[in-house]
Regions:
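C-terminal active-site/capping subdomain that shapes the small-molecule cofactor and substrate pocket
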Residues: 97-169
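Internal helical hairpin/lid segments
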Residues: 81-107
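Internal alpha-helical scaffold of NAD(P)-dependent oxidoreductase catalytic cores
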Residues: 1-80
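Charged/polar, low-hydrophobicity segments characteristic of intrinsically disordered regions
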Residues: 59-89, 131-137, 167-169
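Short, small-residue-enriched loops and turns at beta-alpha junctions
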Residues: 20-21, 93, 123
């Protein structure tokens, strides 16, 4: 650890392997929704609320996953993950910066959008496939509003603006 750390790069150890992985998955889905928020003229305040809801969903999914005992962590460790660079830091960057393919997909989600064309223009969008996988296994993973909202927009063709309004009810 000491051999590779610098002033600009710090390693933070965690036992919460599941939480870090779930953070990466939900972060991509959240970035799609953050792009849709921006495209539909929501303020950054709503993206911050989205991030908070996303952290709640990460905690919910992580705490419910039935995993091997050696990977289980207590609530304190999961909360530490939520505020770590692996979760909060990565989510902020991905939700606010237009270089994210997931956010760019969301930016294309306005009114009558052509999802196939948007995906063709961007290429691989991890959050798109993750949304389907989590939704298909929703009972197992105890998904919440983030995954459901993304699924309603991306796979059910529901109006993005009305889905986003429901997200914050």
């Amino acid at each position: 650890k000491n051999n590779i750390e610098t002033n600009a790069f710090k390693l933070i150890s965690t036992k919460d392997i599941i939480g870090v992985e779930i953070s990466g998955i939900i972060k991509n889905i959240s970035a799609i929704l953050s792009g849709a928020l921006t495209a539909n003229h929501y303020t950054d305040e709503y993206i911050q609320k989205l991030i908070e809801l996303s952290q709640d969903e990460i905690f919910q999914i992580t705490s419910k996953i039935n995993c091997r005992e050696e990977y289980r962590v207590n609530d304190k460790e999961m909360i530490k993950t939520l505020s770590s660079p692996a979760c909060l830091g990565d989510m902020i960057l991905t939700c606010y910066k237009d270089h994210s393919r997931n956010r760019r997909l969301g930016l294309g989600l306005i009114n009558k959008f052509n999802l196939d064309q948007v995906l063709k223009d961007i290429g691989t969008v991890e959050g798109y496939m993750s949304t389907s996988t989590l939704y298909q296994n929703r009972k197992k993973f105890h998904i919440g509003k983030i995954v459901k909202t993304a699924h309603d927009i991306l796979y059910n063709g529901n109006n993005p603006k009305s889905c986003l309004e429901k997200l914050f009810d």
